[in-house]
């Protein structure tokens, strides 16, 4: 079995050179005029299949948002439990978290070295309930953390960024104005409205925010770009399957299977990709480590892991998840 570090060093498509170029895009945008081109964070080798995807799905409300940094990794891949998801979501709140753009009007709320206008302060008061909750330094800090997350650097502590306080920028009572951002989505997915015992992590003693989450759980998106909705059938697209990102995804997931990680599969489309990738026989032999979530409820609850669509032995699998998450194994 290949070492995880070797897989990352040889396969991570988010190279230092690429990330430096993206960081410069962000710096230029932060310092730019009130109206200036948005950053464009697409991989060069993705152009062909991106064009195909956008032609088929953009007008159906499933277009990709390249102004936001790809966000496929959360937590530490050495964690005992992995969860495979579809792709990073999108709302106008994410544009604020990534770029400092107003979730309501789309104009700049945060830029380097300048005061906000009365119009911008009006939007801020309406959306945040007061003036701007942070400044350009806080925006740059979030951007830096998102860039660092793409490196998958195992020599530094790996956090679950979207439940970190730095990413909780919007009062929850105001999310109806512009949709849920990544922070609220992940908190609801992992913990619900609070630390309910009906959710897997709280039942293991993991509360929010807790550094143990990044050490115990690794989340991996099957597709790296943001969209409000995503057509999962595109995971079968031949051009996408030859992309650098998907090849890296396969190497990572292959390592997780071989090393005996517990793997939670979020969607049936991902389960089919996983089964095709490792083969039906190997998939069957690893059923003790793979559990599919019921598709009805989007939250990481024990009930969703033991839903009527899951296997009869799902409660046994959930208990094994709880053992490794709580460190009892």
Regions of interest found by a model, annotated:
Residues 1-38, 161, 168-179, 230-257, ...:
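C-terminal capping/extension of enzyme domains
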Residues 58-207, 281-298:
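Adenosine ribonucleotide-centric catalytic and binding domains
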Residues 81-85, 212-213, 217-221, 262-267:
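A structural signal for short, well-ordered beta-strand segments and their strand-loop junctions
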Residues 87-91, 223-227, 268-273, 298:
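Short, solvent-exposed loop/turn segments at secondary-structure junctions
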């Amino acid at each position: 079995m290949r070492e995880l570090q070797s897989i990352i060093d040889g396969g991570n498509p988010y190279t230092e050179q690429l990330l430096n170029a993206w960081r410069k895009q962000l710096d230029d945008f932060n310092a730019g005029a009130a109206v200036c081109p948005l950053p464009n964070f697409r991989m060069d080798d993705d152009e062909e299949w991106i064009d195909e995807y956008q032609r088929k799905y953009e007008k159906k409300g499933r277009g990709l948002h390249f102004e936001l940094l790809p966000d496929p990794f959360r937590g530490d891949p050495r964690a005992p439990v992995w969860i495979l998801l579809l792709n990073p979501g999108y709302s106008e709140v994410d544009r604020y978290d990534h770029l400092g753009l107003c979730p309501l009007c789309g104009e700049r709320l945060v830029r380097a070295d300048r005061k906000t206008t009365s119009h911008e302060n009006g939007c801020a008061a309406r959306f945040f309930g007061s003036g701007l909750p942070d400044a350009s330094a806080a925006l740059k800090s979030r951007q830096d953390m998102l860039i660092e997350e793409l490196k998958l650097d195992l020599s530094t502590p790996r956090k679950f960024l979207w439940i970190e306080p730095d990413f909780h920028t919007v009062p929850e009572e105001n999310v109806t104005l512009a949709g849920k951002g990544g922070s609220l989505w992940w908190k609801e997915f992992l913990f619900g409205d609070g630390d309910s015992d009906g959710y897997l992590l709280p039942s293991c003693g993991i509360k929010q925010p807790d550094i143990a989450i990044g050490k115990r759980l690794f989340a991996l998106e099957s597709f790296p770009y943001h969209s409000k909705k995503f057509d999962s059938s595109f995971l079968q697209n031949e051009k996408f399957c030859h992309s650098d990102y998907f090849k890296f995804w396969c190497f990572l997931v292959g390592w997780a299977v071989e090393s005996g990680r517990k793997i939670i599969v979020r969607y049936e489309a991902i389960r089919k990709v996983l089964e095709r990738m490792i083969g039906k026989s190997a998939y069957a032999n690893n059923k003790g480590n793979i559990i599919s979530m019921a598709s009805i409820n989007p939250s990481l609850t024990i009930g969703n892991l033991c839903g009527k669509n899951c296997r009869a032995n799902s409660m046994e699998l959930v208990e094994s998840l709880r053992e490794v998450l709580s460190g009892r194994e």
